[in-house]
Amino acid sequence: MKRTYQPNVRKRAKTHGFRARMKTKAGRNVLARRRAKGRHRLTVSDE
């Protein structure tokens, strides 16, 4: 059976990348939370 995770770099960046996060209010909240927590990688784009 086909598994649910079929890795694709472009899809990953477009969905969870920095610019995708910045587009919505909720996404900006995600970044703010991760900054407050002290995450070194805010998004998958920062790898």
Swiss-Prot record:
It holds the Pfam family Ribosomal_L34. Residues 22-47 are annotated as: Disordered. GO terms for biological process: translation. The lineage of its organism: Bacteria, Thermotogati, Deinococcota, Deinococci, Deinococcales. The gene is rpmH. This is Large ribosomal subunit protein bL34. Keywords: Ribonucleoprotein, Ribosomal protein. PANTHER family: LARGE RIBOSOMAL SUBUNIT PROTEIN BL34M, MITOCHONDRIAL RIBOSOMAL PROTEIN 34 FAMILY MEMBER. One of its GO terms (molecular function) is structural constituent of ribosome. One of its GO terms (cellular component) is ribosome. Belongs to the bacterial ribosomal protein bL34 family.
